[in-house]
């Protein structure tokens, strides 16, 4: 799916008029075009399904990989900074940090690809909970591992700048699949690494 930049420009112009402003005035005359270009960038992830994102970042390594059933064999990455926009108010979700872990099953994904997946999934109209589920699903597709965990901490503009206006309120979500959900030793190790 391609983003319809021209339609966005027209709708932003209409919003400016609905707000009681003049979209032809000096400070606003290029605003519809700028917003459309920004939306094309910040919502880039909406152009791709989870399957397509998995295909895009499917760079794995299998040779010389010694992975055992030992619970110590875990790939863990944290403090991946992303942003997103909530689908309810189009408000920014910011100061988001993602931690991702998986237990390899014969192949590993390139580390930069993990961060790229998180970034691309965030570039959609989202719920924080769905970001975690989407990342876990894509990582499972690429690595064939059922054992995936995603922890996300973030602030939501819809909570901090409107409504209840609780600045500093953070939301933490967890998506736990496979052993991260069923094996206490594995989940304890995950939490130890996350809080380290």
Swiss-Prot record:
**Per the record, what are the reactions this protein catalyses?**
GTP + H2O = 7,8-dihydroneopterin 3'-triphosphate + formate + H(+)
Question: Which residues participate in Zn(2+) binding?
Answer: 86, 89, 158
Q: Write down the top EC class of this protein.
A: hydrolase
GO-annotated biological processes = one-carbon metabolic process; tetrahydrobiopterin biosynthetic process; tetrahydrofolate biosynthetic process
Q: What is its EC number?
A: 3.5.4.16
Which UniProt keywords are given for this protein, alphabetically ordered? GTP-binding, Hydrolase, Metal-binding, Nucleotide-binding, One-carbon metabolism, Zinc
Q: Which InterPro entries match?
A: GTP-CH-I_C/QueF, GTP-CH-I_N, GTP_CycHdrlase_I, GTP_CycHdrlase_I_CS, GTP_CycHdrlase_I_dom
This protein's source sits in the domain of life called: Bacteria
Supply one GO molecular-function term. Answer: GTP binding
Q: Which SUPFAM superfamilies match?
A: Tetrahydrobiopterin biosynthesis enzymes-like (SSF55620)
- Gene Ontology cellular-component annotations: cytoplasm
Which pathway is this protein engaged in?
A: Cofactor biosynthesis; 7,8-dihydroneopterin triphosphate biosynthesis; 7,8-dihydroneopterin triphosphate from GTP: step 1/1
> How the protein assembles, per its UniProt entry?
Homomer.
Indicate the family of this protein.
Belongs to the GTP cyclohydrolase I family.
The protein here is known as GTP cyclohydrolase 1
Species of origin = Clostridium botulinum (strain 657 / Type Ba4)
Q: State the encoding gene.
A: folE
């Amino acid at each position: 799916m391609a983003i319809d930049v021209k339609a966005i420009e027209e709708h932003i112009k209409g919003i400016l008029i609905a707000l009681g402003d003049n979209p032809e005035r000096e400070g606003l005359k290029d605003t519809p075009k700028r917003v459309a270009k920004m939306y094309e960038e910040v919502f880039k992830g909406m152009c791709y399904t989870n399957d397509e994102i998995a295909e895009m970042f499917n760079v794995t390594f299998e040779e010389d990989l010694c992975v055992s059933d030992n619970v110590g064999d875990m790939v863990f990455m944290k403090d991946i900074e992303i942003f997103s926009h909530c689908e309810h108010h189009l408000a920014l979700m910011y100061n988001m940090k993602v931690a991702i872990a998986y237990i390899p099953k014969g192949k590993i994904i390139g580390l930069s690809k993990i961060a790229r997946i998180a970034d691309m999934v965030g570039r959609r109209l989202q719920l924080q909970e769905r970001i975690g589920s989407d990342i876990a699903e894509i990582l499972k597709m690429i690595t064939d591992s059922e054992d995936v965990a995603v922890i996300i901490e973030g602030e939501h503009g819809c909570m901090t700048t409107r409504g209840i206006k609780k600045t500093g309120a953070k939301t933490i979500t967890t998506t736990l699949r496979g052993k991260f959900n069923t094996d206490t030793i594995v989940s304890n190790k995950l939490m130890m690494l996350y809080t380290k």
